[in-house]
Every structure is written in structure tokens, then in C-alpha cells.
Amino acid sequence: MPDSQQDHQSETPQVGTPLGPPPPPVPRSATPLPTQKVTDVIRHYRPAKLFRPSKRDVYHVTSLDFDDRGEFLVAAGEDETIQVFDILEGKSTKSVPSKKYGVHLARFTHHSRQILHASTKVDDSLRLLDLHKESYLRYFTTHKDKVTCLALSPGSDTFISCSKDDTVALWDLNSRNAQGKLKLATPYLAAFDPSATVIAIASQSTSSILLYDYRNYDKVPFATFDLATQEERYTPSTRGRMWTRLEFSNDGKSLLVGTDYHGHFVLDAFEGTVNAFLTGRNGASGRAAPVSSSGKPLGQGDACFTTDGRFVVGGGGDQHNVLVWDIQQATEIGSVLKPIAKLPHRGRTAIIEMNPRYNMMASADKEVVFWLPDEHSRASDR
């Protein structure tokens, strides 16, 4: 059970703080009109609203996730609280403490009132929370060490979890028992492709990405992408140690391997070739990679694809900008790409997520920030 209602009321860690002049309303103005293609607005995102911790103690946000409709955002934090935001209203609407078990990798299921998350203490189980009742519907127990990644199928109630116990478990939300299990070397990141038929698993110690047919996960992977040579070329000092994110683009053509220092890899999702290496950041995100035992705050990677699959947005490390890369600029295999834009921000971007439906994104470090295309910025470019 989440903590008591009394604790719930005392644990309201964030309040909305406008940045500069009052921002335009987040909602309906953020609806993507036919003329608002990602290419038209990507350079013009600016912070529109900031949710700052109201308590004296400041905690790091460790994960962000949008629901399928793009109408809600869930954040998990070091303060062991699940925070839910209404995107259309531009406000925080619910705070659910999970003091007993902790919380990380909070993910909406396909039911917007249900959230799946990993535990950070007591045990290493996964928990399915009913937001309306503020009670747990189900526990999923099989892992013997910390969970490092949760990935939900885009087409069903199945999901996969990765753990430091060197296992990947396959689940159905309707059953507390794992449907299957893989034993691999450091399989700390995983992702479904958009068709929900392929799962990619990143094995950091072997510098490889394994592709499985989800329906035949117990068979050998049908493809293995070996990145050892590419790591030696682009990231020699952090080989096998700094992968933080694995994500397919929505068109299924590209696979992002986010790292926490030198840059990010964009692979051809079919061939495994490195189409581009994304540079331009200054330092690390300040979060622990899944393979790390540094004691840094947890995270989920600081880069992601835009909804059209053409761009990658990511944190700038110590320089406090959000960087934008256009992967269509990769004219040859292995292109080294610099950002096409640096979106100004006053704080660090340790986590970033694109809204799946609206022209809007969210970032976080110690505060959650909503970003919207700024009309004044667009007008100045005309």
C-alpha cells in the first residue's frame, strides 16, 4: 500500500512557478496543428513552466513518463514520491508517497490511472499502482537485485524489466508471475520496437545490442549489433560503462543508444550500423548509469527521439542547454553530428521526454520543467 493519507497530505513536494512572464496556457494551444510540424518548432522550444520543490530539502527527480494520450506526466523522485501532472491544465494534480519501498522508473500503463514502478529498497519487486484508489493492484516479484529498466509494449499489457541480477523478465500486467526470463551478461537496458514484435536488449559489458523476436524470446537473438569497435572510436575512456538509454524511433528505423559522457549513438535499427554519433555536450548528466556504482542519483538517460524520429533532444551536461540534433544530417555512415540548436535553460537537464501527442516536452533534474514552442522566438527567425 502507498503510505497513509496523512503522509500524502504532508508530502506535496512541488508547486508551479512560471518562468519570466506568465506562459501561454499549456493546453489546447499546444495541440499540434497541421502547420506545426516538428521541423517547424523544434528550434523554438523554451521553458514555459517550472515545478519547484516547496520543501527545504531538495531531491532529484529520477524518472519521467507521459501517458499514451500525452495528457498526464508522472515523475518519480529521491523523496520516494510519485508526482502526477495534468498537461492540459499545466499543474501538479497528485502526489503519492511510497516511503516503504521507494520508487523509480514510474511508467504509465495503457490505462492512464495505473502506474508501474520499480522499488528501491526492502525488495526488488515491481508494483502496479491504482492512482484513483492510491493502492497497489499487484506486485511482480522475480528479480534479486535492483531493476535498471522498465519497458512497456506499445501494443499490449506486456512489459519487460531488466535487473542487476543479470536477468531480463517478460511479464503480463494481469499476472504476478513472469511469463519468461533471460539470463544475460549485464542486460541493463531494453526497448520494444514500435510494432511490439521486437525487443532490443543492451549488454553493456559486451558492448552489444541483442534483438529478439518477442514471440520467440527463448530462441537465440536474430541479430546482434557489436558496438565494441565504435566505442573504441568514439568513447574509448568509457567503453561498456556509460550506456543510459535504449530507444527505437517511432518509425522503427533508428535505435538510440544514449551514453552519459562523450555523446550518443544512433544506429540503423535493421543493420546495426552507426549512422551518427551525436556530440556537443559538456560533461555528464550527473546521474548514475545502470552499470555504475558511483552513488550518483538514479536516472533514465538524458536524450530521446522526437515523435517524428528525425531529431534527438538531450541534455547539455554542465552547460545547461537542451541540445537538438538532426539525424538526417548524417550523410554517411558514422557521421559525427553537432547540435543544430541549443535551447536555453537555467538548470541542468538530467532527464528529458517528448510528449507523444502534443508539441511539448518535459525535462527534470531537481525540478520538473514543461517546454513549449515559443511564438516570439519563431517570429524573430522569420
Locations of regions flagged by a protein language model:
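WD40-repeat beta-propeller superdomains and closely related acidic/aromatic-rich repeat-like regions
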Residues: P2-R382
